[in-house]
UniProtKB/Swiss-Prot annotation:
Top-level EC class: transferase
Organism listed in the record: Methylobacillus flagellatus (strain ATCC 51484 / DSM 6875 / VKM B-1610 / KT)
Pfam families named in the record: SPOUT_MTase (PF02590)
Gene: rlmH
GO terms of molecular function: rRNA (pseudouridine-N3-)-methyltransferase activity
EC number: 2.1.1.177
The keyword Cell membrane is annotated on this UniProt entry: no
InterPro entries xref list: Alpha/beta_knot_MTases, RlmH-like, tRNA_m1G_MTases_N
Statement: the UniProt record of this protein carries the keyword GTP-binding: no
UniProt record similarity statement: Belongs to the RNA methyltransferase RlmH family.
Protein name listed in UniProt: Ribosomal RNA large subunit methyltransferase H
Amino acid sequence: MKLRIISVGHKMPDWVQSACTEYTKRMPREMNVEIVEIKPDKRASGKNAEAVQEAEAKRILEAAGRDYLVALDEHGQEVTTLQLADKMRGWMESGRDVSLVIGGADGLHDSLKHKADWLWSLSKLTMPHGMVRVMLSEQLYRGLSVINNHPYHRE
């Protein structure tokens, strides 16, 4: 199974890349993790936030293809680590690849949220883009450690 983290944004600082790499390299071989960066649309020439979101949504959906689509959104469902592990177990059993989407500065377009198979909230807080990437990478690793009975996660 492939986990694809699709992230709208610019090149991240070294600490973000280093932390994400640390968690993704710990993943088992059968869990391939790929980070796909989508260039953010510029708010030039009178483009409003919705037009920017819509253009980004099209590129995100192209990158996701037919994957199970998870959109990270502050209004999404909050879950515990064990609930996330159950979700991930279901993804693995389905045989589909999974794309997890982090929106740009203006967030995700409503059309993408409606197409998502699951809206997931890491937190109700607004967080820096890089921090979300790191938290997402860590939570995916933690969920897999629960599935594989690895001692990384403790209840």
